[in-house]
């Protein structure tokens, strides 16, 4: 049995009937809101069977005069 499963299957196990939509799950994956985080395999997001949802742990604090390129990178979540 594989350790990685799709986000939708993981959400059914983690949240039950109240699982978020596929779009929201992808946002969670891009924001690394699971521990261990989801990874993109080809066109699909996959996640470890034992991962847990942790949400946003901390927001980076940027100075007001930060470089616009830095602000854009942080805003995109990359």
Swiss-Prot record:
The yes or no answer to whether the keyword DNA-binding is present is yes
Per the UniProt entry, what is one GO biological process?
DNA recombination
List the keywords (alphabetical).
DNA recombination, DNA-binding, Viral genome excision
Q: What InterPro entries does the entry give?
A: DNA-bd_dom_put_sf (IPR009061), Excisionase-like (IPR012884), Excisionase-like_sf (IPR038137)
Q: Spell out the Pfam families in the cross-references.
A: Exc
Task: Classify the source by domain of life.
Answer: Viruses
The Swiss-Prot or TrEMBL record annotates one GO molecular function as: DNA binding
| Function in brief | Excisionase and integrase are necessary for the excision of prophage from the host genome by site-specific recombination at the att site.
**What is this protein called in UniProt?**
Excisionase
Q: What is the lineage of its organism?
A: Viruses, Duplodnaviria, Heunggongvirae, Uroviricota, Caudoviricetes
């Amino acid at each position: 049995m594989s350790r990685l499963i799709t986000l939708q299957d993981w959400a059914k196990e983690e949240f039950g009937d109240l699982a978020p939509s596929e779009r929201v799950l992808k946002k969670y994956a891009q924001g690394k809101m699971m521990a261990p985080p989801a990874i993109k395999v080809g066109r699909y997001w996959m996640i470890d069977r034992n991962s847990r949802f942790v949400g946003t742990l901390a927001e980076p604090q940027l100075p007001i005069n930060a470089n616009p390129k830095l602000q854009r990178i942080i805003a995109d979540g990359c």
